[in-house]
């Protein structure tokens, strides 16, 4: 594909990029053409394989957080990210509701045990930011616990990065109409129904 064709396909997606401080926002009002998407995905996945070799060779430790609204596409993005990777060096962590024992522990403790060793990539499908998100919204955490999280989270992440961990954080969002549409698709599709929780209905 020529550079001109590449630009044409990319422009067709009405791709918009805005920057606010350290935050980069991407907006797409149309879907990418399927062939263009698949071609680009193959290129990106090839680069991911190279990156994993580099991580192993250098001993880097990488943590990637995927956060966002329900049904925003976190799981699909993680699937495509990990498809080409060697599972020996890349793990996905998707923790459920804290157990009664975990509720008595330091809030970050259950995440610490999943942090990577040298040469590993760990992807969190939701993370410690649950405390400021779903736990806050659904009333699973007290106001005091949430306020303490706002103090502790930057300190915790600073400890990780100062120890040499490369921390990457991504937020996925969709509008209310698209979210409702995706919830309905999950209700109607038995193979996707497991993605629904009682809180989504």
Predicted regions and their residues:
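Charged, amphipathic alpha-helical linker segments immediately N-terminal to NTP-binding catalytic cores
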Residues: 1-43
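Conserved nucleotide-sensing/catalytic segment adjacent to the nucleotide-binding pocket
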Residues: 33, 90-150
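Pre-Walker A adenine-sensing motif
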Residues: 46-56
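Conserved catalytic network of the ASCE P-loop NTPase/AAA+ motor domain
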Residues: 56-57, 85-87, 100-101, 113-117, ...
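Pre-Walker A (Motif I) flank of P-loop NTPase domains
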Residues: 58-64, 118-119
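Glycine-rich phosphate-binding P-loop
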Residues: 64-82
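Conserved nucleotide-binding/hydrolysis micro-motifs of P-loop NTPases
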Residues: 71, 98-101, 127-130, 173-180, ...
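A glycine- and Lys/Arg-enriched "phosphate-lid" helix/loop adjacent to the NTP-binding pocket
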Residues: 134-150, 160-201
């Amino acid at each position: 594909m020529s550079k001109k064709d590449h630009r044409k396909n990319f422009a067709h997606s009405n791709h918009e990029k805005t920057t606010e401080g350290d935050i980069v926002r991407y907006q797409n009002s149309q879907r990418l053409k399927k062939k263009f998407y698949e071609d680009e995905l193959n290129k990106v996945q090839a680069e991911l394989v190279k990156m994993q070799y580099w991580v192993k060779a250098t001993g880097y430790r990488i943590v990637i957080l995927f956060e966002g609204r329900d049904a925003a596409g976190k799981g699909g993005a993680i699937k495509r990210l990990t498809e080409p990777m060697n599972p020996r060096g890349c793990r996905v962590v998707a923790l459920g509701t804290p157990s009664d024992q975990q509720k008595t522990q330091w809030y970050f403790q259950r995440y610490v045990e999943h942090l990577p060793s040298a040469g590993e990539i760990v992807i969190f499908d939701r993370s410690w930011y649950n405390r400021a998100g779903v736990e806050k919204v659904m009333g699973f955490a007290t106001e005091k616990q949430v306020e303490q999280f706002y103090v502790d989270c930057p300190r915790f992440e600073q400890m990780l990065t100062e120890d040499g961990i490369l921390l990457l954080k991504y937020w996925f969002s969709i509008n209310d109409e698209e979210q409702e549409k995706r919830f309905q698709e999950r209700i109607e599709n038995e193979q996707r129904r497991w993605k629904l929780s009682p809180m989504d209905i």
